[in-house]
From Swiss-Prot:
InterPro entries, per database record: Arg_Kinase, ATP-guanido_PTrfase, ATP-guanido_PTrfase_AS, ATP-guanido_PTrfase_cat, Gln_synth/guanido_kin_cat_dom
Catalyses which reaction(s): L-arginyl-[protein] + ATP = N(omega)-phospho-L-arginyl-[protein] + ADP + H(+)
Activity control, per UniProt: Appears to be allosterically activated by the binding of pArg-containing polypeptides to the pArg-binding pocket localized in the C-terminal domain of McsB.
Motif (RDXXRA motif of the pArg binding pocket involved in allosteric regulation): 337-342
GO biological process: phosphocreatine biosynthetic process
Name the UniProt record assigns to this protein: Protein-arginine kinase
Entry's Gene Ontology cellular component terms: extracellular space
Keyword Transferase set for record: yes
Domain Phosphagen kinase C-terminal: 24-254
One GO MF term attached to the UniProt entry: creatine kinase activity
Binding locations of ATP: 27-31, 92, 125, 176-180, 207-212
Family note: Belongs to the ATP:guanido phosphotransferase family.
Gene: mcsB
Top-rank lineage group of the source organism: Bacteria
Amino acid sequence: MSLDKIMNEAISPWMKGDGPDSDIVLSSRIRLARNFKKYQFSTMQNEEEAKQIQELFKKEFINKTVEPFGEFELLKMNELTPLQRRVLVEKHLISPNLAGTEYGACLLSENEHISVMLNEEDHIRIQCLFSGLQLSEALQSANQIDNWIEKEVEYAFDESLGYITSCPTNVGTGLRASVMIHLPGLVLTKRISRIIQVIQKLGLVVRGIYGEGSEALGNIFQVSNQMTLGKSEEDIIADLKSVIQQIIQQEKMARELIVQNSSIELEDKVYRSYGILANSRLIQSAEAANCLSDLRLGIDLGYIKGISRNILTELMVLTQPGILQQYAGGPLGPEERDYRRATLIRERLRIEKN
């Protein structure tokens, strides 16, 4: 695996999967926060300690193979251009926080299912991504990597509290489980606000597709647990999965209601968005996201034939500003990005239809 390959292949293997409930659930993510006993927290550490953690991973873990994830490569943030960092964020391989650090790094698996972020808010954050609703499978893979790393380092762990983390909400298991979910039916029926309120009362968090502070573009929401102390990993996963399954049922009911009461209006909305995507010469990010959401809904409901439902996930990533500029070989102005975005979408749809 090379940096060029990571940068030039915008679609990660997990995006091409077709996991359970993938008509509504786009992806499942597990993140484990861990700190090393011998070092201060990342928020307090000095440059020397941050470099020592990088060197430890360079020595012990790069070019090592762990099945089924392949080899691992270490990407240091201060050796990447701002554009390369942005691409990694847009591919969901690193967090925006890590991209902004000077001594952060990412240990990335060949198949891009696993990303271990170094020197972010915690010493390491192990991330595992799967398509569809596969929280248990993602947790199993994350634990496999956790055990692999723990053979070489001693974690900060307290018998009564669990794993010690820089943020109190992560103390305990250090587990953050999240699901990316497409909810156009609940948005169109204006039920989404009530659903979000219920989710939050259950102790869960609802965010946009790039986490804290990001927008829910294209009717895509990220739902995750908040507290980890006093709960087992299995309980956290079971609680989140139960809520997600209820949201899935609510979304299906909302879609059925729209089809029953406003079928021709919905079909018109889908085909108008399809027409914009198939013919536009300039299109901005927000409009593209909304039209792609309509197209995906049309595919799921059977209005649109011959186009893969994965097109929403793929094009939501492919048309992000960083990836567009990476493909262009350098910086682009807003209008140039809008032109390239429209061109890429038209070509992708043409390939699908052929």
